[in-house]
């Protein structure tokens, strides 16, 4: 299993090529509280994608899509014209080998080919 620091959160969090996020141990600076290293559990956002809360060094917490963190950590920033696709169509499988960049058109075409009932429902709704 490979791990790398998450871009923008170096020294705070790292992610594996399997899509697992952990925090680093952070010692106390004032003797009051230290933070142990621990696995950060993702949550489902309601559309099937996993998200994760990360807190920066200033204490500000933000939500991030796990598949985007994995891709950008092990590859490069995602261009605005591209989207991440899960090759096996399982939105919770965020292993780096299961992620690929597609255009919006390619991603929608794949979704409709894998889910023909969606297109039929749209046709029935419009007509």
Regions found by a protein language model. Give the residues of each.
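Conserved recognition-core residues within compact binding domains
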Residues: 1-84, 90-127
């Amino acid at each position: 299993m490979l791990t790398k620091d998450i871009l923008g959160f170096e020294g705070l969090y790292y992610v594996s090529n399997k899509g697992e996020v952990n925090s680093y141990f952070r010692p106390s600076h004032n003797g009051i509280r230290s933070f142990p290293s621990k696995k950060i559990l993702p949550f489902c956002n309601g559309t099937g994608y996993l998200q994760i809360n990360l807190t920066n060094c200033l204490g500000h917490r933000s939500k991030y899509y796990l598949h985007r963190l994995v891709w950008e950590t092990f590859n490069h920033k995602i261009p605005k014209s591209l989207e991440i696709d899960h090759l096996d169509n399982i939105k919770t499988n965020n292993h780096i080998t299961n992620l690929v960049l597609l255009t919006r058109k390619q991603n929608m075409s794949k979704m409709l080919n894998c889910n023909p009932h969606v297109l039929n429902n749209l046709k029935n709704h419009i007509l």
